[in-house]
Structures are given as C-alpha cells and as structure tokens.
Amino acid sequence: VARVSLLDREQVLPGESSAAQLITEDPVVASVDSCFILRTYSPLVTVAGGKILMPAGERPKNRQMKAALLEYLDKLSEEPPLKERLLALINYRGIITAADAARMNEVSLVELMRAVSPFEARAEVGVIRGGEAVLLSKRKIDELGETLTKALALFHGEHPERKGMPAEECAKVLDLQETKFTRELLSLFEKQGIVKFADDRARLADFEPFDEELFSAN
C-alpha cells in the first residue's frame, strides 16, 4: 500500500506522464530502472505504471529543492550513461559522500571513482579524499569559495597581523561540522588558487600578513 505524490502537477490525465514519489506504508526493495504498476485498493483496478528512477527517494523541503529534484529526474529519464548519471546526481545534491553516490547508482566505489575521475580532472567535480570520500559539485565549490573569500577579506581587514583564519573558524564560517573535512576542503581550494592554506590557517591568495618584526627593524 502506498500514496502517490505528484511532483509537477495536481493530477495526471489518461495518456499523460509525470514525475512522482511513491510513499509506501512499509519498506520495500527496489532497484534502478525497475518497472511497476499501480492499482487501486478497492476495486482492484490497474490505473498507472512507471519506472523507478531513484530508489532511495527523498522528499523536497521547498520549491527550490523540488525544482532541482525534477531537473535531476528529467535527466535520469533520458537513461544517460553512468558518468552522466553521476554528474547529474552530484549537481543535484551539491555535496554527497562517494558511498551514498555509489549506493544510489548501484555500483561499487571503484566503479564510481573511475567514472568521476574525468570530471575531477576538468574541475567539474571536487573530490575530498580524507577519510570517507566526498564529492562536491562545481556550483557548491564556487558557493563555499565565495563565502570563505568574503569572510577572509573581513578577517584580514580586522587582523592584518595574523597569518590567516584558523581552520576551526573556517569550518564555522562555512557551516561545516567537521574540522578535518574543512582542512581537506581548504587544501582543495588552495589547489584551485582560491586561498592559501598553511600552518592550519587560510588566507586570501594575494594576502601577505603584516610583518611586525620587519616593521620594528626598520
């Protein structure tokens, strides 16, 4: 028994199709591209059918998330190859663990990382490898990078004598829970030329701290 939640309209007329979410009363086993039929409970009549695009479904919390989900499902409905499926998922989620991405696409971690490698080489996807691998979309990297550079500009203005913002403080600025992950992200930002990261501190790429000793010597 399940409820059907349409994602892009109020009703589906005969001959039409729509993206929908099946909300089951009890857990069920499903896999990508599995077909299904829908029947009314009483009387027992077949009313619709479809194909599963995303077994591990999630309910969008707002209009923006719903629009992003619909865009992702539209891409999946085209039956793209694995590489394009992964890129669409990463762009939809913004940030996702490699393990979750592999599970959602029913592939091994080795297969997933092999498929992601070309996107990483072209800087279309960021990969954090410290501990559990995490994948970030280019949009998410740009968003986090912009937030951090604005915070660093203010920090340097208030503390020109300091070598940079501590990683723990960067984590708070970026609203990240784990400092270890933040350090790996800062290292990625450094590779992309967004910041300099040394001695567990981040600074803008063109910032040089005020050298008090040199000033005193002169």
Model-predicted regions and their roles:
Residues V1-N218:
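C-terminal effector modules of nucleic-acid-centric enzymes and ribosome-associated factors
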